[in-house]
Design a protein with these regions (language model features):
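Conserved NTP-donor binding/palm subdomain of two-metal-ion nucleotidyltransferases/polymerases, i.e.
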Residues: 1-139, 145-346
Length: 346
């Protein structure tokens, strides 16, 4: 890892506070534009709420660890940086509130219709694992529904003014459908309806997470272990861990306290052992999370682990939105191939 920005991303992106595992060099006052790039890159990683809060903490308590230069130049630069950071954070929170309100309306109508549906990822993770909507960025509403109830949910969405966006032919076999609606203040609202969180058929042969598996009454319904499986499968199969947020989701859920036996059972049922191992290992390596490390150890032996840890490194994840990201794509595709070899249900 060569970019100072990446070190500060890792240092400032833990919602629980400053990450002591990373002590990057400060920026000289002439490098202040790079701190604006840091805010933008945090936005692309969807970790800006934590970064802005921790940035403020550093600038108040130890500004010389972040910026060096004459005090009369640093003070106005700090003020401008914090003003932009707080403005961006306010926009992130405002959109999260709009999306959460949309999700609540949808879930109320779905419940009245008796539909088997669960709110997943975004607003659910924010409220269940992050401590509130202000602590996690998300850009849409995600609903997981039993396949045979999808048409009825479509009727609910259409009744609220949402329009179905037909997928391109090459994506017709995916288990995700998009619905959109214009909002007077928040642009376009996107709702993604999933019948299986593993969207592509080539990966779905090896792993799967349906509504009934996620919200299994025999395992206590939607538990922290269920959310951790959700976070790992989503980060791995949909995005190949191309944002820090997918690691932080696992980090925050692991901190809730996880029943290791339940986690192992759910991982086997869904085929998620390798994605889960990747998520936990990265949370331990990047953020030093002991809970993640302990859970990772309970999964051993992990199929293809020696190959996996060399492909999906901490540096790869932290660099995934930087200027060299295109050079990293071949390694991500290798990881995707590995997911098809490591059938966790075997």
């Amino acid at each position: 890892m060569t970019r100072k920005i990446e070190g500060w991303l890792a240092r400032l992106s833990d919602p629980a506070g400053l990450n002591p595992n990373w002590l990057p060099q400060p920026f000289a006052i002439k490098e202040m534009p790079r701190l604006n790039h840091l805010l933008d890159e945090a936005g692309r990683h969807n970790v800006r709420p934590a970064l802005v809060r921790n940035l403020g903490l550093v600038l108040r308590s130890a500004p010389d660890t972040l910026i060096t230069g004459p005090p009369d130049a640093i003070e106005p630069a700090k003020s401008l940086l914090l003003a932009r950071a707080n403005e961006l954070r306010l926009l992130d929170v405002a959109r999260a509130v709009v999306l959460a309100d949309t999700a609540r309306d949808l879930l109320d109508l779905a419940a009245k219709a008796g539909l088997p549906v669960a709110l997943v990822k975004g607003a659910d993770f924010a409220q269940a694992a992050y401590g509130g909507l202000h602590n996690r960025t998300f850009t849409d509403v995600d609903l997981l529904i039993r396949r045979d109830a999808e048409p009825a949910l479509g009727d609910v969405l259409a009744g609220l003014g949402f329009v179905s966006q037909e997928p391109p032919l090459r994506h017709a076999s995916r288990t995700e459908r998009k619905w959109t609606k214009a909002h007077p203040h928040a642009g376009t609202i996107l709702v993604e309806v999933h019948t299986d969180m593993v969207h592509t058929p080539e990966l779905r042969r090896h792993m799967s997470l349906t509504y009934d598996a996620y919200n299994d009454p025999a395992k206590g319904g939607v538990t922290p272990a269920a959310r951790l499986i959700m976070a790992a499968l989503h980060g791995a199969t949909s995005h190949l861990f191309a944002r820090l947020q997918y690691v932080v989701d696992g980090l925050m859920i692991a901190r809730l306290g996880i029943d290791a036996k339940e986690l192992a059972e759910r991982a086997k049922l869904s085929g998620a052992r390798l994605p889960l191992a990747t998520a936990l290992r990265l949370a331990a390596e990047i953020y030093g999370c002991p809970h993640s490390r302990e859970l990772f150890d309970t999964l051993k032996p992990i199929p293809w682990s020696r190959v996996e840890r060399r492909i999906m490194t901490a540096a790869l994840v932290i660099s995934s939105k930087g200027p060299q990201r295109w050079r990293l794509l071949p390694r991500r595709y290798l990881y995707r191939g590995l997911l098809q070899l490591a059938d966790g249900r075997a």
